[in-house]
């Protein structure tokens, strides 16, 4: 069954997500970009709050929307984020010439790294093939431009199916604990297609917020999403709140 990853920006949102049925807690600042990073102090506070509350859910955090060069800056940020106590560190991998060197360097980090392939310009087959041959904790596909629709508006289902199949069948990831996930402005209405793809996890932010992805996490929307993912309710979202 596909697990539910919910992206949060604060202690309060993290506790709401944990209580509302999230299987993964993902830490990022939506107002700072697709993979916007949170301050290190906030990462430490959220991890401590979840563990103090008794939650053992896996926690991931992004390093922020950093360019892959200079590589030293990326690796320094990876180490700093990992030191905050998160279980996984997510790093965006755009389709550019620096991706191969970045993937090789990230694979050597003493942390559980999840490269996140940015799908807006398409996936470079050679970059995905390289990543699948390296000992990463998992691989994801996501979108950068959240105003361009959901992931399904950027990649068609056959391409997504091929991505998931390649992650699961290739290199050190095959038969291991490596995870294959999808994200990218996913909506409640996308759930039938998400279920059909059966990724290990699917990431949500916009669908569980009041207003856009920069708004506050909405417990009612989270409950509706959780129930819908498990087939408990029809796929109809809560009514939109009127904006002032």
Indicate where each model-derived feature is located.
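C-terminal alpha-helical cap/extension of soluble enzyme domains
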Residues: 69, 181-244
């Amino acid at each position: 069954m596909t697990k539910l990853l919910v992206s949060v920006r604060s202690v309060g949102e993290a506790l709401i997500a944990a209580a509302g049925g999230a299987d993964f807690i993902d830490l990022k600042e939506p107002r700072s970009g697709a993979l916007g990073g949170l301050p290190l102090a906030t990462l430490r506070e959220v991890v401590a709050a979840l563990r103090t509350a008794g939650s053992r859910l896996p926690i991931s955090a992004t390093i922020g929307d950093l360019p892959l060069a200079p590589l030293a800056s990326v690796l320094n940020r990876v180490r700093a984020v990992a030191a905050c106590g998160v279980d996984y560190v997510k790093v965006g991998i755009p389709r550019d010439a620096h991706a191969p060197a970045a993937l090789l360097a990230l694979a050597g980090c003493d942390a559980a790294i999840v490269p996140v392939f940015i799908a807006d310009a398409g996936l470079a087959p050679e970059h995905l093939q390289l990543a699948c041959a390296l000992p990463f904790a998992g691989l994801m596909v996501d979108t950068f431009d959240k105003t361009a629709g959901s992931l399904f508006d950027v990649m068609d289902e056959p391409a997504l199916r091929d991505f998931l199949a390649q992650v699961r069948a290739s290199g050190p990831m095959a038969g291991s604990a490596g995870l294959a996930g999808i994200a990218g402005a996913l909506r409640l209405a996308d759930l039938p297609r998400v279920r059909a793809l059966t990724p290990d996890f699917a990431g949500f932010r916009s669908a569980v917020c009041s207003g856009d992805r920069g708004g506050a996490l909405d417990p009612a929307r989270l409950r509706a999403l959780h129930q819908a993912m498990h087939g408990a309710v029809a796929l109809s979202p809560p009514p939109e709140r009127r904006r002032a």
